[in-house]
């Protein structure tokens, strides 16, 4: 029995065809994955199914009285409001315990959700147990890890009792164990009769997926059962250095100003506590020119460790930490430190105004601000333009951040991190949202920058294949402790 049918579904944006006459049928009991390269319209496709995106053609969803709501979409990023009912969070707020108190707790958030739906109250208990949320009830939303936040948003969606649960890259940013756990609980959800449609990569197809709809750059699609779909292993080792403009890269990096320091980072017996211990007695040295991989499961303390290095965490002053040869708290400002670092994180774009355009996001890296709040001169404009050309994103200069796909947002933020040619690059999941080709290209750039420009690198990824070949040092965290 067909439960969802699409006939010649077409989406056009700004004169460009994103989806071109897509037709398919979803039958009772089927679970679908949507794959395709960056920019092929995967997120647009999900929004069309929910009615959030205008389309031509026909979409028919069979009514089912067991499910009060037809379709619910969980987007890749979620925007929370604080207790003041605004969204004016700032990036460092999660590391400032007093300011973080303006964010609601997990329990308060869920109570608000069920207050609008009496029937949902009966569902909360088993969902909270299934998704292991009860232990998170006292936690502030702004302090949740990627995996914790993803579980919370899925529970919220399921409390609406949808017939179709749509997920946009649900495994992005999750470690191996968290991905396996989420896959298992989604299978349990599917067994309840809910149909799952998720955007993911062909290399991350969950075991319960029955059909794959693959989108292409020209807006067309192909449909296959999983037994005929390719569950390929991603190989990103080769890179795409042949397509890299080496002359421009050397102009922007090798010929720039050199900073001299023996150690970028020196910390001894560092401990960070809030309600509980986040980092426990960490000792770590990063010498000039070293390239490090920082790994560990979700919630192991990686983001907190990076916040100490990037001058975002005030607990640095209570610990024995030296950055670029100076002890924290001896007179240097956070801006003195940030001048020497280029930083990317999975959630950084959430703190920019959506109306900021791609050029201004990249240019803000010159001043380490979340937005461009001053005029820049012609030389600076040329510099930003060249970096965007190098990353092949010059076509995004005038487009607003909210108009960009997740992968395009990520590339603009990479330009922001690189634009001032800093001696230390701190890249936290920089390839999140990029397709295989973009990831290989970015790895090639990082390798070339670090080797030719003698850069110091701290690189975080849950995927070993995403780590650049120039990385030779490794640190691993687990439960706040260094285990490697």
Language-model features, listed with the residues they occupy:
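ABC ATPase nucleotide-binding domain signature region
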Residues: 46-115, 306-370
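Conserved beta-strand-loop-alpha-helix hinge in the C-terminal portion
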Residues: 208, 215-248, 469, 473-484
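Catalytic Walker B motif of ABC-type/P-loop ATPase nucleotide-binding domains
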Residues: 165-169, 425-429
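Hydrophobic anchor residue at the start of the ABC signature
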Residues: 154, 414
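Conserved ABC ATPase "signature" region
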Residues: 119-136, 363, 378-396
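Conserved ABC ATPase signature
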Residues: 140-144, 148, 373-376, 400-404, ...
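The feature captures the beta-strand-to-loop junction immediately N-terminal to the Walker
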Residues: 35-37, 295-297
């Amino acid at each position: 029995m067909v439960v969802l049918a699409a006939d010649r579904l077409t989406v056009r944006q700004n004169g460009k065809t994103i989806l071109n006459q897509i037709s398919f049928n979803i039958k009772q009991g089927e679970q679908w994955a949507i794959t395709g390269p960056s920019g092929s319209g995967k997120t647009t496709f999900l929004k069309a199914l929910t009615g959030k995106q205008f389309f031509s053609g026909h979409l028919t969803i069979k009514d089912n009285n067991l499910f009060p709501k037809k379709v619910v979409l969980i987007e890749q990023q979620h925007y929370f409001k604080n207790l003041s009912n605004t969204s004016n969070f700032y990036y460092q707020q999660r590391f400032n315990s007093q300011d973080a108190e303006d964010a609601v707790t997990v329990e308060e958030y869920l109570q608000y959700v069920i207050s609008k739906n009496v029937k949902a109250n009966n569902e909360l208990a088993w969902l909270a147990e299934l998704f292991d949320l009860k232990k998170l009830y006292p936690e502030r939303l702004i302090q949740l890890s990627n995996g914790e936040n993803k579980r919370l948003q899925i529970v919220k969606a399921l409390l609406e009792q949808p017939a179709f649960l749509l997920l946009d890259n649900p495994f992005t940013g999750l470690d191996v164990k968290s991905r396996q756990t989420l896959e298992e609980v989604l299978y349990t959800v599917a067994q309840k009769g809910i149909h799952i449609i998720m955007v993911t990569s062909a290399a991350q197809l969950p075991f319960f997926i029955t059909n794959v709809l693959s989108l292409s750059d020209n807006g067309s699609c192909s449909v296959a059962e999983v037994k005929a779909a390719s569950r390929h292993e991603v190989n990103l080792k080769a890179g795409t250095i042949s397509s890299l403009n080496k002359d421009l890269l050397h102009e922007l990096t090798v010929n720039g100003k050199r900073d001299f320091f023996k150690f970028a980072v020196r910390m001894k017996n560092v401990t960070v506590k809030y309600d509980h211990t986040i980092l426990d007695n960490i000792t770590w040295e990063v010498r000039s020119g070293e390239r490090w991989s920082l790994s560990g499961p979700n919630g192991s303390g990686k983001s907190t460790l990076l916040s100490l290095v990037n001058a975002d965490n005030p607990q640095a002053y209570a610990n024995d930490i030296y950055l670029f040869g100076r002890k924290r708290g001896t007179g240097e400002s956070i801006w003195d430190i940030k001048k020497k670092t280029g930083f990317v994180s999975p959630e950084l774009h959430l703190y920019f105004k959506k109306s900021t355009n791609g050029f201004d996001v990249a240019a803000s890296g010159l001043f380490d601000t979340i937005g461009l709040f001053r005029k820049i001169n012609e030389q600076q404009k040329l510099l930003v333009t060249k970096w965007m050309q190098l990353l092949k994103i010059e076509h995004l200069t005038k487009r607003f951040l909210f108009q960009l796909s997740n992968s395009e947002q990520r590339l603009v933020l990479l330009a922001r991190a690189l634009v001032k040619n800093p001696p230390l690059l701190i890249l936290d999941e920089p390839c999140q949202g990029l397709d295989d080709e973009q990831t290989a290209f970015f790895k090639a750039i990082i390798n070339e920058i670090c080797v030719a420009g003698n850069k110091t690198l701290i690189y975080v990824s849950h995927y070993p294949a995403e780590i650049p070949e120039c990385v030779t040092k490794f640190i691993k965290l687990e439960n706040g402790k260094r285990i490697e």
